[in-house]
Swiss-Prot record:
Protein name as catalogued: Clustered mitochondria protein 1
Miscellaneous comment as given in the Swiss-Prot or TrEMBL entry: Present with 17000 molecules/cell in log phase SD medium.
UniProt keywords, alphabetically: Cytoplasm, Phosphoprotein, Repeat, TPR repeat
Originating organism: Saccharomyces cerevisiae (strain ATCC 204508 / S288c)
Domain of life of the native organism: Eukaryota
Amino acid sequence: MSEKKEEVKNATVKVTVKLPKEDNHSHNTKHLKKTQSSKNNDISFEIGKESKIQTVLDVLAMIPSSKYLTNVGLKTIEGDSQLSDEMSIKEIVGEKSELKLQLILKPYSAREALKHVITVRDFIGFAQETSDGLSEFAISTGSSFSSLPLGPIKERSKQEEKDEKSDPEEKKNTFKDVTDEEKLKFNEMVHEVFSSFKNSSINKLLTSESNIITPCVRSLSFAPYNPVPPFYRSKGHLFYLQIVTLEGESFYITAIPSGFYVNKSNSTKFDPSPKENTDENAHSSLIYYSLFDLIASRSKKFISHVQAFEKKLSALDSTSYVRPSNTFLHKPWFVSSLPPNNPDYLRLQTAALDTTPERNFNDEFQAIKDLTTSTLQDRIEMERLFSKVVHEFSVTAASGAMSIFYSDFVAMNPESPTRDQIFLKDNIFYSYVSDVSGNYEGKGGDEAAIAASNQDLKTINILNRLHMHEVRYLLTTVVEFAGRRILAQTPVPGLLATMGNKIVKDANTGEEVTEDFVNDINVKYGLDEGLGKIVYDADFDSVLEKKFVKAFHLKKHKVNGTELAFSSQSKGIVGFDKRRYILDLANTYPLDINFARQNFDNIEETGNRYPHRQTLLRPELVEKWWNNKVEKEGVEFEKAYEENLFSYNPDAYQVEGIEDANVDEMSNYLQKEVIPSVIQDYLSGNLSTPYNGEHLADTLHKNGINMRYLGKIIELSQKELDSQIVHYEQNLKAVEQDNKEYEDWEKSYLQKIENMIKERQAKINKLVQEGKEVPKELTEDLKLNDEEIKKPTDGKPVVVAYDELVPLIKISELEIVSRSLKHVLKDLSKDVPVFLVPSLVAYVFNMLVGINYNADPKPEPVDEFYPVNKCSFAKLTRSELLEAVSKQAFLRFRHQLPSNWIEAYMENPFTLIRSVSYKFGIQLLNKEYFFTREQLESYKQSLDKKIRNKFVEPPTTFSLSDLTIIPRVKFSEYTSSVSEEFWAQGASMINEDKQSALTLLAQSITVLEDVNNILHPAVAEKYLSLSAIYNKLALYPEAIAFCRKACTIYERVSGIDSFEMMRALTNLAILEFSNESPYNATVVYNRLAEILKVYELPKIHHPAPTSIFNHLEQLALGVQDTKLAIEVLGQLSSYVVELEGKDSLAYGYTESRLGNLFAALKDFHRALEHITVTQGIFTKQLGMNHTHSAQSRQWVNGLSSLIMDLKQKKQLAQDQMSTTGSNSAGHKKTNHRQKKDDVKPELANKSVDELLTFIEGDSSNSKSKNKTNNKKKHGKK
């Protein structure tokens, strides 16, 4: 790692690039001003010596003065020849620290001119930020985070930092640098949060902003006069364009090697010759090297729009509008509106004119893996290309799969049934995921094959990180659409090729027949399905042993006498390119044998079995178990890895007669240790309470738990909850008994003290009567036995972990229901024509949750060629649908849903619909949906009278016109190992060398952005982590900037309502709090409140709402607005009462805090009201002798006395007004003595606490502040 650190500090070179002089290639006209594409100046920047010339060109492609020059090269100032793009800077400069280069304009070819046109289009607003590789099949929405009314990040002054260090306690309590204007805005925003918790709607939350990027011309496309006629093609004409400016002018352009010019063509006449410019300011040359300059010369509005456009972008973080290159944008389930499908011929035309040769993704992928990685720059370049080709394969595969789903491809075997058909296009092999070969017969058939395709992809994800050169694998993507699933893979080179054929005579008939030559590309190692046996190859075996076996902890074993290093279902093939490929890697992981036995093997009735036996353990579980074994056995990690200790046999319990104790142990480890420990982690707060099903799945998967254990999660969580409730109720009874005992003890102890006092007084009286001196011991305090006194206890309250367990149970149930419903939809739709699936989905949704609006919904017709009423789903009844969901819930999750399970989702159906939509692939239109007739009538009354009269009532809640079906793409993932290494080193040295550590962390993110592009989930995760590190270092402004960037990325790639976004928003709010920006923090809390409300998380006891209220109270106190803090606690108190009632400890704690705040305002009557409430709660829940109960009594007594004292003083002041000054003074004196006498009631009537105070002379606690233990969250009882 020290070498890497040196490479980070590698010397940079100052590069100066001289742009071309003004001539016909660059028109420095008045109208171009600052937006001209190239100026007669130099561009300078720093770049690493290890960088290549291509990197310099990449930088120039983003600089305003050169970004419109796309067909260029570079040469040194002294040299004549163009430098190779792959040449490194170091090769050119040697030991020098400066490099001067000249930009060379190259003549256009049709290909380069097309590239230039597309680049210009992108820069002038045709490349919308909502487009990605799936835009043809699904809708993405823009960012709304950038429209949040957040103020600028507050910079901390050195004096503030100094004050914070010198007086951290003061810093914690109050904010020093908050203006009156911000306080006012903060107050208003707090009230918006209150409103959001009550009135937020799904329609408002998921209304996306209009696109940030909009075109600066009306249209730019190829003219209908293409292709170029032969007469002009030979004269250099490349193609013709047609442009319509914002002024409405339409003109035609000819592209030639030296650039572009306006020609004489119009809509009815073709004349590609140059059109003379009659403008007085016209230039001598009519040819523009840059298309941008040509448009600018013809349109004044174009320049102003480009300036406004660039100004708008400059005000935003680039993450809010940059297009993704290595990932897909989030596809929300609720889309604001259908995207405008404006005429843009170029979208279709570019495909026709594209001269790029057909890609061979496998060749590209394998060539990238062969690249040299001797230097850091080489490694980064390899990873960048790797990530790029993996994503581009997924895009192409998804597009190809969709063509198959829509029957636009012809199969290689068209006569076969649909599920057996295979396809080959663009060197990608497609097949429906089913058990065509019969490998999973007896194990679940198609269901097992579907599970195996997911498991195969998991293996490939791990292989992506291993960088094995001697073992190769295939690019793989899985596409699901409308209940169907297609597997797309790059084929092994030569495997599908025909080796030619020969004509031979049939031995029986004598007829001549054609016979194919045998393909010599076949299985060398593992399962040969053609031969029906396991084959062995020593070379293949030795290669697998080097890294593959160790990485997966596989044990070498024998199957039918043949030795194998991996599963007997996997294959090893030597391709035509002589590389070794491994395929069918699903069974690389061990079987979860306990689950298989319990839910498949030992279930005699097939209908109650788990759908398949392909129940493998997750890779995270295997790693967790292996690391646990290494630690328990006390073996060094390196030794365990190199010697392949604690390995397992992947064929154990898969092949008859093969067993493995480690496989049994892993299965036991999952069920008996991991699952219970995860529930305990939720209880202890080590794991965040899930926001939604995706959050839960992410947490379970990271801990190695399969989703088939959701039923087990609910079972254990409910058992824990029931146990806690029983314990809580038992404790209440015990407290009640303790209170009785305490009252009895108090009464007897008071009586004892009174007797002691009487005895002492009798002795004193006797001595006085006898005229004797009273001994000192009779005038001193009573000597009491401390052991007899029951002092207040501070025992831990017995609470029920509702906050942790109820959301876990409810979200697990929601996930079971939505996943079960997804399987029902898949079963219903897999044999239905694709075009009918929207009708099917609308029908199912109407039956599920629209029954109170229309009790008898019917499926809508789509096309007369596909009559809906003849489909099986049209005969489905609601009871059958509900029963089908319940059956899937039991089969797949071993969980029995209650008979009325649907009722839980009828009040807010969108919670269920959202979850199902993400899983099946559904996008709904953002509009008003009516689930009851009352909702409809209410909506109609809210309309303007004119609109109401024209309003047409929808026949059902959902219509097929409200939704679309979209593909769900499962693709292999890749992350940069170089970035991870920089991050690990930076994180490890943060305490020793902060500056170097932060530099390494920043370098890690820079590398990751280079490899994956800035718009990527992995980049967002790193920014969020970096934000947390800066927060720990008290560098709050920087932490906020990083966290805001993470929020923007997460919103675009994960969604506004994703758990990643909610987690990032929560962090951001806390950071804004730490930076003393109460308004900004509250803006973020308001967005969180909206999300929490629309998905009804407050109703399932989620702790997030309470956390928000608690932070809002602290913010209010920070700006010293006690009245606002009281309002916040009032809202919290109402929320707690709604969830738990007025007997809960949470309510008592909140009332106690309210009492304190009212006391601070000197509103002692209100303070007494709230503190009095706590006395009964604490006594019932904690016991009379608990510290909180004792303090509450002291508060009540103290406040009561204080109120009485103030009342007496007020009365005294009134009396003084009616008397003379002297009498007043005398009266006051008498009254004061009277008060002293009055506040000493009979000792027998005092409580033990009061009595002790009296005897011991300790009055310091009479106004003790009730500091309640507020560590427990609101969900505790």
